């Protein structure tokens, strides 16, 4: 009594399950990790990527590389996603997190082959993660964020793995000054918003050494009228987000005019309105008016007569930065302007021509809580890479200021945590001890990769590093990424923020757990009709190829 087979899934569906899926996920993760393995450490190689639009990206930043890569496998997509998460959360460690997650999955493969249930492996990984976090906190050391020399050293160890390391001193100074400028403390809570208030302006030309941090704001705008002043000391600044033009009616407004005088009256009302708006501004005797909207020719005429400089169509984000820098308040209506809305914190308003473009500088502010970083360089590609590196440096500085704890770099903290996990696994009983010990083994991938990227002997140096960590008081020993030899990170001054390390470990282990829990992939395919529909269009190419 054999009936017809019951089809539950559509014929266009493809289903993979069990062991095949798990090994597929692990291989995808390992492939992604292998792509950027050479991008770790001070001897990191750079990758050149061509984006779909034909633009070139040259970088060794893990997140920037993976962002440009097109992948199809769902596990590879989730690996790329964790790199982006790491970048948004702490701004650094994007390469480490991918390598570590790939290795965590790689060491789990042998247990799956031995028919160990994924739940057992996951349980061991969770235990190991808790112990890793506690161990990291134990070996971390507090740091005084007001010690400029030490802060520069910390940022330098982050920059050392980047292309910008040739100008490390300048970059460290820029990153530290920018973060200290935008740091705001309210109700005992520190807020450092680099994205909003530390703007990076890239201007091709000049040399990288010309880059600097402005104590104020720079905007790519010129004054609206040639007769307006282009250099003002101690300016009084008014910021608006309304236009100095006659208000057009809302959509499809109609006015019916029966007499000629009515038309003249309408024109007169427009002029009176603009005159009134300008009088509201002139009443406060400002030197500079900056608006996000337009300024009509008539309004410019009144402002020039009152010796007021005007800048129009400034971005909202730039306007917010100017407000923070000079202490002005952005007004939405001119008739509501008060004396306290005028910004008097800026020391200098100046228009400069750099290359072919005009830039407005509002600098020498008394207590700016916003700044602009001006980057100069030979080409757009170099500037883009320098900006990426600088963003990482600022994020590292921000992490240390908010959470002032450090752990040793150069693979020292990984080896230290791995040693403690290995010792703990000896006291465990049952099957879980093997995946638990495998986590310790996976952590060694960071120092191993550092040694490989130097071209040194991996086995010899890693073995001697393991032996070193069994001794008392050698927790800060790691790999000198420049020379590929053992060194004390404390003496070399290579430190990493605790926040970055914690996030790296958590993200890597949780991603490994997530991918190990997958045992089935169902993928929907395009309908057959769609493929047939496209074939006639492709058909004419066949004869050409035959020729």
UniProtKB/Swiss-Prot annotation:
Q: Does the keyword Glycosyltransferase apply?
A: no
Record's compositionally biased regions (Basic and acidic residues) = 525-534
GO BP terms: namely: protein folding
The UniProt regions of compositional bias labelled Low complexity, in chain numbering, are 535-547
Question: Could you say which residues bind Mg(2+) here?
Answer: 92
Under NCBIfam families, the record lists: chap_CCT_gamma, thermosome_alpha, thermosome_beta
Question: What name has this protein been given in UniProt?
Answer: T-complex protein 1 subunit gamma
Give the encoding gene's name. cct3
């Amino acid at each position: 009594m054999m009936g017809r087979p019951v089809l539950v899934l559509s014929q266009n569906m493809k289903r993979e399950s069990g062991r095949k899926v798990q090994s597929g996920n692990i291989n995808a993760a390992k492939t992604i990790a292998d792509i950027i393995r050479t991008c770790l450490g001070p001897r990191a190689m750079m990758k050149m990527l061509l984006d779909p639009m034909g633009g070139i990206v040259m970088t060794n930043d893990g997140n920037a590389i993976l962002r440009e890569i097109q992948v199809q496998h769902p596990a590879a997509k989730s690996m790329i996603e964790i790199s982006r998460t790491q970048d948004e959360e702490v701004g650094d460690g994007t390469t480490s997190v991918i390598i570590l997650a790939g290795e965590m999955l790689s060491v789990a493969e042998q247990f799956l082959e031995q028919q160990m249930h994924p739940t057992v492996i996951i349980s061991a990984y969770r235990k190991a993660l808790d112990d890793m976090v506690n161990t990291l906190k134990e070996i971390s050391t507090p740091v005084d964020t007001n010690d400029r020399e030490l802060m520069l050293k910390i940022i330098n160890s982050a920059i050392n793995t980047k292309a910008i390391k040739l100008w490390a001193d300048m970059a460290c100074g820029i990153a530290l000054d920018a973060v200290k400028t935008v740091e705001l403390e309210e109700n005992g809570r520190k807020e450092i918003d680099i994205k909003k208030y530390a703007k990076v302006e890239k201007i091709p030309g000049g040399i990288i050494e010309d880059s600097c941090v402005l104590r104020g704001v720079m905007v790519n705008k010129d004054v609206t009228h040639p007769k307006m002043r282009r250099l003002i000391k101690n300016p009084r600044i008014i910021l608006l987000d309304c236009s100095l033009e006659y208000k057009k009616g809302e959509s499809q407004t109609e006015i019916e005019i029966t007499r000629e005088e009515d038309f003249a009256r309408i024109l007169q009302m427009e002029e009176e309105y603009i005159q009134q708006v300008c009088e509201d501004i002139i009443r406060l005797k400002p030197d500079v008016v900056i608006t996000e909207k337009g300024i009509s020719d008539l309004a410019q005429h009144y402002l020039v007569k009152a010796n007021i400089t005007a800048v129009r169509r400034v971005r909202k984000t730039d306007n917010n930065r100017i407000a923070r820098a000079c202490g002005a308040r952005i007004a939405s209506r001119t008739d509501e302007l008060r004396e306290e809305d005028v910004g008097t914190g800026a020391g200098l308003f100046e228009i400069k021509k750099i290359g072919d473009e005009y830039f407005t500088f509002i600098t020498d502010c008394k207590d700016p809580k916003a700044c602009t970083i001006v980057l100069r360089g030979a080409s757009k590609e170099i500037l883009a890479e320098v900006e990426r590196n600088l963003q990482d440096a600022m994020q590292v500085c921000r992490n240390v200021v908010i959470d002032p704890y450090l752990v040793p770099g150069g693979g020292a903290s990984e080896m230290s945590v791995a040693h403690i996990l290995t010792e703990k696994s000896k006291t465990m009983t049952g099957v879980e001890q093997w995946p638990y010990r495998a986590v310790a083994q996976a952590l060694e991938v960071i120092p191993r990769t550092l040694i490989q990227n130097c071209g040194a002997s991996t086995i010899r140096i890693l073995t001697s590093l393991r032996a070193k960590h069994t001794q008392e008081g050698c927790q800060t020993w790691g790999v000198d990424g420049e020379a590929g030899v053992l060194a004390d990170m404390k003496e070399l001054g290579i430190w990493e923020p605790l926040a970055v390390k914690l996030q790296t470990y958590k993200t890597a282990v949780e991603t490994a757990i997530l991918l190990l829990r997958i045992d089935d992939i169902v993928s929907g395919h395009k309908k057959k009709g769609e493929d047939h529909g496209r074939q006639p269009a492709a058909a004419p190419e066949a004869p050409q190829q035959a020729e």
